[in-house]
Design a protein with these regions (language model features):
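Alpha-helical scaffolding within the catalytic cores
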Residues: 14-15, 101-113, 185-186
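Surface-exposed cleft-lining segments at the edges of enzyme active sites
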Residues: 3-5, 99-105, 127-138
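Active-site-proximal beta-strand/loop segments in catalytic clefts of secreted hydrolases
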Residues: 1-4, 30-34, 59, 73-81, ...
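Active-site-proximal segments of metal-dependent phosphoesterases and phosphodiesterases across multiple
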Residues: 124-145, 169-172
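Metal-dependent phosphoester-hydrolase catalytic domains
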Residues: 101, 149-160, 165-226
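N-terminal, active-site-proximal structural segment of metallo-dependent hydrolase catalytic domains
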Residues: 1-72, 84, 141-142, 160, ...
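Beta-strand-turn-beta hairpins that frame and shape the catalytic cleft
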Residues: 87-98, 107-128, 226
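Conserved beta strand-loop-helix elements of the APE1-like EEP
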Residues: 62-69, 81-98, 192-206, 226
Length: 226
């Protein structure tokens, strides 16, 4: 789901972590994540790839030491001037292999970032460009081709591409070869009434629901159980 891109005090990460405990969420994908650097000590961040502003902070404590959990926070940073392009994946440390991916199809577009879980499932976070549904679908198709290449190259069993596609599922199905693997709840995920947040995956969710309280932005939290 989307965060508050103009959230300079970094409270978005605090709320995400609280929800992970409250709702027992394993992986949380966030678009427009804002500025995460202010909420985690600078020495905790490690840059994953030298050529990208892609960082990870590992084994961050959520909750109390006796009842809390440890999470790894993956974050693509674009500085304080372009927070709408920042993205994050927060994953329970015990489920994370520590292997991550980032891919661009165009330097002027937001990337897709991904993590590999210990059941050999890769989870990718997407924030497709807005304004034109067909263009958003074509960008998604290009990313899915990259994901298929990753799957074959690294012998990954399954993938889940989830996030804000900026394209309704019916348009996506007309434009994307892999759209038969599109999974969505048949209701609005944005306050405008549009369904833009869902997943395209090689496995099917057993359950999904929409949190109608858009606490972070005008997009609602989409929860899927695999």
């Amino acid at each position: 789901m989307q965060g508050n891109a103009y959230n300079g005090d970094c409270s978005t990460l605090t709320e995400v972590k609280a929800r992970m405990i409250r709702e027992d969420i394993d992986v949380f994908c966030l678009q427009e994540s804002g500025n995460f650097f202010g909420s985690i000590s600078a020495e905790c961040w490690n840059r994953i790839f030298p050529e990208y502003e892609f960082y990870v902070a590992r084994n961050m404590q959520i909750g109390t030491s006796s009842r809390g959990i440890l999470v790894n926070v993956y974050y693509v940073a674009y500085g304080k001037e372009n927070l709408r392009c920042s993205m994050a994946i927060i994953v329970k440390s015990e489920l994370d292999t520590g292997k991550a991916a980032i891919t661009y199809i165009n330097p002027n577009l937001r990337p897709v970032i991904g993590v590999l879980l210990n059941d050999n499932t890769a989870v990718y976070n997407i924030h497709a460009p807005s304004g034109n549904h067909n263009f958003a679908a074509s960008v998604t198709y290009c990313f899915l081709q990259e994901i298929q290449d990753f799957k074959l190259k690294y012998n990954i069993d399954n993938y889940v591409l989830i996030g804000d596609f900026n394209c309704p599922p019916d348009v996506m199905k007309k434009n994307v070869t892999y759209a038969n693997k599109t999974h969505y709840a048949d209701e609005a995920t944005q306050n405008s009434g549009a369904c833009l947040d869902y997943c395209i995956a090689s496995i099917s969710p057993q359950n999904m629901y929409i949190n109608k309280n858009a606490a972070f932005s005008d997009h609602r939290q989409v929860v899927m159980d695999f």
